[in-house]
């Protein structure tokens, strides 16, 4: 049990083979990328996929804003597909100032995923960034049949409430 002694009875718990809920929502990582693929990582998912949001539609835009730590090139982005047959478009706003800047996005990659999961998408062409430059990554995602296609993090329960997830600026 990776949840420690705080879960169940000192870390032990009973699961019936006839449990109606076990195995209905699982996340499994079957292919891991090399940790040295890229020089830097900018992230806003310190807790990982904890829930989903959307607007009762199968598609949505979401964005995260970052500040470059040095002169560099943005070569890839990573995000979740919450179900099968998901299509996406990835955009970058190289000079982010405020919400209105999101309208100045540039398409840098598009494609589809057959399965749900966490994916790293290489950009068609790397985006040059200057040290301290504020930029945004915008993803438009469409997941047929979904009403909440965007994976999100939040303080879902006692195991996650102690984490500070105010690390950045995000939009849905």
Name each model-derived stretch:
Residues 60, 117-118:
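Repeat-based blade/solenoid architectures
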Residues 118-126:
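Exposed aromatic-hydrophobic patches
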Residues 17-103, 127-134, 140-172:
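Beta-sheet-rich sandwich/jelly-roll-like modules and their strand-loop junctions
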